[in-house]
Amino acid sequence: VQIKAVSPANASNSGTATVTLHVPNQQTENSPVELGTSGSNAKDTITSGGKTTCCGGTLGALVTRGGTQYILSADHVLARSGAGTAGDPIVQPGLIETNCSPSGTSTVANLTQGSFNLQNPSSATVDAAIAQVVSGAVDTSGNILLLGSSTDASGVPAAGAPNGGKGQAASVNLSVAKSGRTTGLTCSAVGATNVNVSVAYSTNCDGSGTKFTVIYTNQISILGGDFSGGGDSGSLIVTQSNATPVALLYAGSNTDTVGNPVSDVLNFFASGGNTVSFVGAARTGSVIGCSLPGPQAAMAARLAAQKVTPSHDALVQATAVRDAHSGELMGHPEVQAVGVGASYDHPGEPAILLFVTKGQPRTNLPALVDGIRTRIVEGESFLQRGLLSSEESTALEQSAAPPQLVYSIPETEVARAKVVHAAHVDELMKMNGVQGVAITSSVDSPGQAALMIFLIDDVAHPAIPQEIDGVRTRIRASSRFHAGFEGKGSQRACPVPRPKRKPANAVPDSKPKSKP
C-alpha cells in the first residue's frame, strides 16, 4: 500500500512510501509453533493442464484425548473434505504460502481423524479434523497467536492459550474473537444460535471436482462479512472476556461466518471412553487485542445496522395505517410518539415507529398493525409527542441511540423462539432461496427474539411471513454459505502485527523436520 506523510507545519512538505503488509499468521513459525497459524495437508494440491493449485487454512487449537495432543482444525483443511488418509503430513505454513512447494514447510502433525465420509459427505454433522502432533513441533501450552491478555512493549497482543476444558455454549450477542491465517485477529458478536444452514462444498480445494451440500443443525453464526476470509477455516472462536472456546470456524458468506459448536466437535472425537478437551489453563484475562482501537472500530462497524429506505408508496401506506390506529397505539402508557420509518428486521419494508420510554415495562405492543411492522425506538425522553410528521419522525429517530444488528435476549425469549424454530424450521429450509434458519434478536423490537431467515442474494424466494406463531422474523440476504469462502470479496480487516519469536531450544526427543 502507498502511505503519504504530510508535515503539520508545512503542508507542502510531504513524502510517500510503499509498504508491504505481511499477515503475521501466514509466516513460517519457529518450532514449537503456536496455533492460529497457516497450515494444510501436505497432499492438498490439484494439478490440471500443467498448473498446480494448492490450498491452506488455519491450524486452530490444541486438544487432548487420552493424554495425547492433537491439532484441531476443519476437515476441509486437514483431511481434504474426506479425501485424506490417516497419517497424512500436516505442514506449517500451508502450501499456499510456499507456492505449492514443500520446501519451506515443516511437518507439525499427522492426520488422525476427520468428520467427512467421502462416500457420503453430505451426512457430516461437523466440519472438523484432528491430527496428532509431532513431538516438539507444537507449543504444548496451546498458545494461539494474538489471543493473549497482554501486549508486548510495542503494544502488540501476545499469544495466549484459551481456557482449557470443554468450552461454553454460545448466546446471542456474546462478544467473540478469533485469530486466523488470513484476517488475523478479528472481533465481533454472535449473531444467531440454533442455526440450520446449507453449506456448499467441492471435493477439490480449488473449487473444482464434485459439488455437494451439507445441511448442518445447531450451528453458530458470527456477524460481519470481514470477521473471516478464505483460509481462516479451522480457527477457534472464543469469548472476548476470557478466551473460552465457543465454536470452530468452517464457512461463511459476505455477511456472516458460521462455526460448529465446540461441544459437538469435542463429542464427535470422543473415543474408547476418552473424552476430548481443549488444552489451556484457567484464564481470567480478556483477549486484549479486541480492546485496541483498530479491532474495536472494526467490531463496531460489523455490529452497526444499515438502513434500507422503503419506497415512497410503502411509506404512504404505512402512514395511512398509523393514522387509522393512532388512538390504539398512543393508548399504551410507554409510547410517547408514533412515526413512520424503515424496518431493520425486513430491510426495505416500512415500519410504524413507536417511540417508547426506555426501561418502562411494555404493555403488549403489537408486532404488526394491518400488515405493517412496528419498530420500537427506545429513549429516555423524546422532545416531540403524539403523531409525528415525516420530518419530525426522522429527527426524533436520529436523536435516539443508533440500532445494532444484535441485542441480548432473555432465556424466556430464547425458549419461546426454540419452540417455533423446531416447529417450522424444516418447512422454511425447503423454501426456494432460503439457506438458513436460526434464533436471533429482533432489531425492530430490542429484547425480543426473532427467527432469522438467511436468504441467498438474487435468488427468488416466496414471501417471508412477518411473524410466525407470535415470533417476529428477520431477513438476512447474502452470498451462498460456502466452506472456504470461495468467491468472497476482498477483506477489510486489518490484522495486528506480531513480533517474531526467537528460535526455541531443540527438544531432545523431537523428530527431525520432514518434507512431504
Where are these regions (language model features)?
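Extracellular/luminal low-complexity segments enriched in Ser/Thr/Pro
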Residues: 1-2
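Short, exposed coil/turn segments at beta-strand boundaries within extracellular/luminal domains
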Residues: 8-18
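Short beta-strand edge segments in extracellular beta-sheet folds
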Residues: 18-24
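Protease-domain processing segments flanking chymotrypsin-fold serine proteases, especially trypsin-like
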Residues: 24-70, 82-120, 134, 287, ...
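Serine endopeptidase catalytic core focused on the charge-relay Asp
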Residues: 28-217, 238-241
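Terminal peptide-recognition signature
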Residues: 59, 73, 131, 173, ...
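C-terminal subregion of chymotrypsin/trypsin-like serine protease catalytic domains
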Residues: 226-228, 238-301
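Helix N-cap motif at beta-to-alpha junctions
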Residues: 356-362, 455-460
